[in-house]
Amino acid sequence: MKAIVFVLIFAVAFAVTLRQGPIVCNLCTGLINTLENLLTTKGADKVKDYIDSLCNKASGFIATLCTKVLDFGVDKLIQLIEDKVDANAICAKIHAC
């Protein structure tokens, strides 16, 4: 019985992860594109402010994305954007895609 419950819990957790994958990936690439524009026009400090503001009020899929971004590191993220790394590649690096 315990084995069946464990398998069911694992299956549900795996299904939720798969389902949120494309959503978080799309949110990530959109966020990276926004941050790229913000970095070009306003600078790194504004990018950090934007991420702080977004993540402080985030929930759901956006909170998931914020966790991935913050775990990766905002300074490293900014460096990748400055190095003109593609949004899809950045999101893959932070495990959002």
Swiss-Prot record:
The keyword Mitochondrion is assigned to this record: no
The Saposin B-type domain, residue ranges: 21-97
UniProt-listed Gene3D superfamilies: Saposin-like (1.10.225.10)
InterPro entries named among the record's database cross-references: SapB_2 (IPR008138), Saposin-like (IPR011001), SaposinB_dom (IPR008139)
Disulfide bonds: 25-97, 28-91, 55-66
Localization per Swiss-Prot or TrEMBL: Cytoplasmic granule
Function per UniProt: Forms pores in the cell membrane of host cells. Implicated in the cytolytic activity of the parasite. Pore forming activity is lower compared to the activity of ameobapore A from the pathogenic strain HM-1:IMSS.
Listed name of the protein: Non-pathogenic pore-forming peptide amoebapore A
Organism from which the protein derives: Entamoeba histolytica
Species classification: Eukaryota, Amoebozoa, Evosea, Archamoebae, Mastigamoebida
